[in-house]
Structure formats: C-alpha cells, structure tokens
C-alpha cells in the first residue's frame, strides 16, 4: 500500500503519490469542460460580431498598445509559471516561491489592465446593453478575466500551503495543476487576441 501511494520515486514529484496522479487526471477532465465553455462563448461572439446596432465600433475603441501590454503580461506569466514548475522539480522551494510570486504579479497586472479597459469602454458608451457585439465581447473577456482572478487567489492559497508544508508530492501536484490552469488561460487569451482584437482592429 505504501508503494502504491508513493509510486515511482523517479517520477516527477507531482506524480509520486496516487492522490496527486488522480487529481491531475481529474483536472484534465475539468479542462475539457472549460474548453467546451470557452468554445461556446467564442461561437456566440462570432455569431454576434457584426451586430453593432449602429453604435460604437470596436476599431474606434480598441487600443493596440494596451492590448499588446496585456498580451505581454499574460504570455510572460506563462513562462514564469513554467520556471516555477521547473524549480519545483529541482526541489527548490525558494525558486518555486519567487517565480510563482512573479507570475502572480504579472497576472495581477493583466487583470488591472483589463479592468481599466472595461471602464474606458463603458465611459465611451460601450457596455453589455449597447449592442449584441459588445454583449458578446464583455461576456467572453469577463469570463476569461474572472478565471484569471480565480487563478490568482487559488495560487496564493497554494503558496500559503507551501509555507506551512514545504514541497511534498501533495503540494507539488497542486502547483502542477495550477500551472495547467494558467497555461490554459494563456492559450485562451491567444485566441481572444487573434479572434477578437485583431479582427476588431481590422474593422470586423
């Protein structure tokens, strides 16, 4: 039983406990559901993208510089998140904490930029009720931004556990699972950047 619980000691730390392996498998299934959710939101957005109701158009409001900053912050955070997992596998608690905190700061910067963006759009007359396009836009990006915010608080909780328990197969599996979640959100953002912003800046 002990062997079954701890598994192969040569495996990455996050896979060394049966609980960790099952949690990782379960999270992959959860990500499948998330893919369905965002696919539905993207499909809805693309159906509504030309329905601006004669109101403000996306190319009149979208700001290239802000979008590029947001993209930079999130993509770099994916890189730093990957480094944190690498440090975890090296057994460096300090490295995990440092790179995870950097990831959180970059994520917080992204959320701050998105909130600023939304406030600006609403001030300029684009809101959920302005048109079908803006309704689809705010729901899609708001859902993504909410996921990023949840991820930030989730990872903060993992950092607290790391401080109390250190690097164990259990905490390592949580770090790895949170990294999968974070990378998934980065991939979703790439689709948002391409399908929403680039098309919007091109006048739909």
Swiss-Prot record:
- Record-linked Pfam families: COX3
Q: Which reactions does this protein catalyse?
A: 2 a quinol + O2 = 2 a quinone + 2 H2O
Question: Which InterPro entries does the UniProt entry name for this protein?
Answer: Cyt_c/ubiquinol_Oxase_su3, Cyt_c_oxidase-like_su3, Cyt_c_oxidase_su3-like_sf, Cyt_c_oxidase_su3_a-hlx, QoxC, Ubiquinol_oxase_su3_dom
- Record keywords, A-Z: Cell membrane, Membrane, Oxidoreductase, Transmembrane, Transmembrane helix
Q: Where in the cell is it found?
A: Cell membrane
Q: Which GO molecular function entries does the Swiss-Prot or TrEMBL record give?
A: cytochrome-c oxidase activity
Biological role stated in the UniProt entry: Catalyzes quinol oxidation with the concomitant reduction of oxygen to water. Major component for energy conversion during vegetative growth.
UniProt name for this protein: Quinol oxidase subunit 3
Q: What is the lineage of its organism?
A: Bacteria, Bacillati, Bacillota, Bacilli, Bacillales
């Amino acid at each position: 039983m002990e062997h079954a619980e701890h598994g192969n000691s040569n495996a990455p730390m996050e896979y060394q406990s049966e609980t960790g392996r099952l949690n990782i498998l379960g999270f992959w299934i959860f990500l499948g559901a998330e893919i369905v959710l965002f696919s539905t939101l993207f499909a809805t957005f693309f159906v509504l993208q030309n329905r601006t109701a004669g109101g403000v158009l996306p190319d009149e409001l979208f700001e290239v510089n802000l979008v590029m900053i947001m993209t930079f912050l999130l993509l770099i955070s994916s890189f730093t998140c990957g480094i944190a997992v690498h440090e975890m596998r090296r057994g460096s608690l300090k490295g995990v904490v440092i790179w995870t905190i950097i990831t959180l700061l970059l994520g917080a910067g992204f959320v701050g930029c998105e909130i600023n963006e939304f406030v600006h759009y609403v001030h300029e007359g684009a809101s959920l009720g302005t048109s079908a396009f803006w309704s689809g836009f705010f729901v899609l990006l708001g859902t993504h931004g909410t996921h990023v915010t949840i991820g930030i608080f989730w990872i903060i909780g993992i950092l607290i556990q790391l401080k109390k328990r250190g690097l164990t197969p259990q905490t390592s599996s949580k770090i790895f699972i949170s990294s999968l979640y974070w990378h998934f959100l980065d991939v979703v953002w790439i689709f948002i950047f391409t399908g929403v912003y680039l098309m919007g800046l091109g006048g739909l």
